[in-house]
Amino acid sequence: MDKFTTLEGVAAPLKIINVDTDMIIPKQYLKTIKRTGLGRGLFSEQRYRDDGSENPDFVLNKSAYRNARILVAGDNFGCGSSREHAPWALLDFGIRCVISTSFGDIFYNNCFKNGILPIRVTQADLDKLFDDAERGANATLTIDLANQEIRGPDGGTVKFEIDAFRKHCLLNGLDDIGLTMEKKAAIDSYEDKAKRERAWA
């Protein structure tokens, strides 16, 4: 998993509440267990028309936001089913941070496991970030994880809270496998000792 230290990028405003995981990645994309290639399916029912052409009115199809790294979203983002394909699709599209007032619990946890930083802010701060994001090509935010701070294009800041363990994992690029590998020396030592003491096993 890639480390998350400081992220600077365009923020796309998605002013929709209760965005569920089925909207993030529809069911027809769940047949694969590969994490790559799902970016095309991200918000596909909003991004594409019935004939397969792009919907020019959807935010991620607008030229200013095609390369967005940050998503500023309405309340209760990621509610619904537990599909881990939702954060996979966001990550494959290029989004590494989602900012909202609240998240679906399972989606929130899955984000951390996949290197995405979900940030909870107050409604007042979200409204301010929506204003920043609506600047289009000038909608650049900086996410400073070490200092738990969002910096806007005018230099304004928004502080955020994050669990210390999850912060450690993101800063060091540690997923579940990475955390296990941190203890490799202790695991090897235990296995060597077990082989000596229970050679019969």
Swiss-Prot record:
It is an enzyme of class 4 (lyase). PANTHER family: 3-ISOPROPYLMALATE DEHYDRATASE SMALL SUBUNIT, 3-ISOPROPYLMALATE DEHYDRATASE SMALL SUBUNIT 2-RELATED-RELATED. This is 3-isopropylmalate dehydratase small subunit. Gene3D superfamilies: Aconitase, domain 4. InterPro entries: 3-IsopropMal_deHydase_ssu (IPR004431), Aconitase/3IPM_dehydase_swvl (IPR015928), AconitaseA/IPMdHydase_ssu_swvl (IPR000573), IPMI_Swivel (IPR033940), LeuD (IPR050075). GO terms for molecular function: 3-isopropylmalate dehydratase activity. GO terms for biological process: L-leucine biosynthetic process. It comes from Nitrobacter winogradskyi (strain ATCC 25391 / DSM 10237 / CIP 104748 / NCIMB 11846 / Nb-255). One of its GO terms (cellular component) is 3-isopropylmalate dehydratase complex. Its EC number is 4.2.1.33. It catalyses: (2R,3S)-3-isopropylmalate = (2S)-2-isopropylmalate. Pathway: Amino-acid biosynthesis; L-leucine biosynthesis; L-leucine from 3-methyl-2-oxobutanoate: step 2/4. Catalyzes the isomerization between 2-isopropylmalate and 3-isopropylmalate, via the formation of 2-isopropylmaleate. Belongs to the LeuD family. LeuD type 1 subfamily. Keywords: Amino-acid biosynthesis, Branched-chain amino acid biosynthesis, Leucine biosynthesis, Lyase. Heterodimer of LeuC and LeuD.
